[in-house]
Amino acid sequence: MQIAVPDQANGMTDVMDTAERNKAIGRRWFAAFNAHDLEALLALYAEDAEHFSPKLKVRMPATEGWVRGVPALRAWWRDAFDRLPTLHYEVVKLTADTEQVFMEYIRHVEDEADLRVGEVLEVRDGRIIASRVYHG
């Protein structure tokens, strides 16, 4: 006896596979960031990716918190890694769906108070097209 498997089953597998691939992007993002490996971090992003952070608003007010494109991301993170050599993130939660990665982490920097952060990565075709950071 054969049992017919609805096409939806394949669709569900595709959804799960995409979510797992996106979660893997999140894991690679943390590994690259914590290693201060700028090129590995940037390789995860699309060339025209956008990034929002309240820290950008403070450090570079003219940006209104946004940088766009890999060259701008490179400059932003190079500055952060140079200024804050002890900067690293402790993962609290990492989850993903087919379009986004949701990350919660604790930002640690020597001589600064720890900061709990939420970040969303939007992913398309295996690359981050946008990232948004949220914290108090």
Task: Please tell me what each predicted stretch does.
Residues 2-136:
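C-terminal and inter-domain tail/linker signature
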